[in-house]
């Protein structure tokens, strides 16, 4: 009779022989809110989660679509509220301290380190040196850290610089996509078993394929494969006043967000998030439309209706729902999350224990 396989012995052997080997599962334990409940849900499957540490997330979109607002503003603010240290790498030379303060970001170096870089190699070296020091720390001393690169599209390769100095503008001939892919791939491997995450913004360009109208992300597809979450964003004009009435002038933008890739929820779902110039993003923006599309809210005349599990009927006009009148959306989110979790638990075997 063959001897049973000694897993513990094998684990000890490979742990000793392979430096930096991580064994077991690395499920995210820390999540950072995007500042919008609907977007959080489409990314992570939970209204209060959002972007995880230990993974790479990319927000890609055209200029002015709200990428920096969400990544360099909302994510940084919520990370700081959770005690997560933020390293903000500004490649566009566009993030002013006054603008960050207006979004509620604490720019003190004890909570935020802002670096201005232009070279892909410099960004890679910075992250690599940080991770060497990070791994040398005792487990109890390791902080939770979020890297934000705003943006990948503006990063340069040494070839770009050399050609520019020589007056040669033919471009890097495909070196940049390879360098970006290498950067993201290395980050994925370095961050996997640690409470360190990367969020990056990137640019998009119009698709030339009539059968695939979605905008294409610049820099190739390599880093898209390596990323855990990819959100595509498009800029639309917001022509509404504070009460939601239609007006002629533009008072903000509507960020149309489409989840191109996620490992925590159903992909290719979309939401429109309103960002007025005067008041900023509401955490409830787009949530009413999302719940109606999912079938949770039913239309009755000019009202939207939600029936709770206890038979209570929550009914209000659309503007009442969008304004979260009397906390009506909070009630729905609380129960809707429970329904989603119960569906997940029902598809497991009776002997399995479902944990969050």
Roles of regions detected by a PLM:
Residues 108-121, 227:
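A glycine-rich helix N-cap at a beta->alpha junction
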Residues 173-294:
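Phosphate-binding/switch region of NTP-binding enzymes
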Residues 1-22, 32, 238-356:
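C-terminal regions of RecA-like/P-loop NTPase motor modules
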